[in-house]
Amino acid sequence: MPVHRFQNPPTIHAPRGYTHVVDATTPSRTVYVSGQVGIAQDGKIATDFRAQAVQSLENLKAALAAAGAGLEHVVKITNYFVDISHIAIFREVRDRYFDTKAPPASTAVQIVKLAMPELLFEIEATAVVPDGAGQVTTLAKT
């Protein structure tokens, strides 16, 4: 079973809601999740930042579940903000989803725009899953 070691070296400033270093040992498999945005399954886009952040994290959970993984397996997230001033709201939302005692490594980036003009936020993730954990859902191509 892999071990995730969450480390914050004393020679680096204290992190705010993330971990500086996550060391994941094998045997395990790595899951890469493409950027998830605030679009619900029915195609509706959430109208404000908080709702988009929540929907993005719900979509992330669903994507991980399809790979037999969960948020507890996430070792790194990258967050894209159209307006970085929303980071405090994101932190509130994020802390409802991730273990605040051992959060994943994290990067926040302000960008000019996302793929659709209504989108305000996107999150992508890397997860390390123990071999044999969870059921992988395989979807047939149509």
Q: Predicted segments — roles?
A:
Residues 1-58, 62-75, 81-142:
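N-terminal presequence-like segments and the immediate start of the first folded domain
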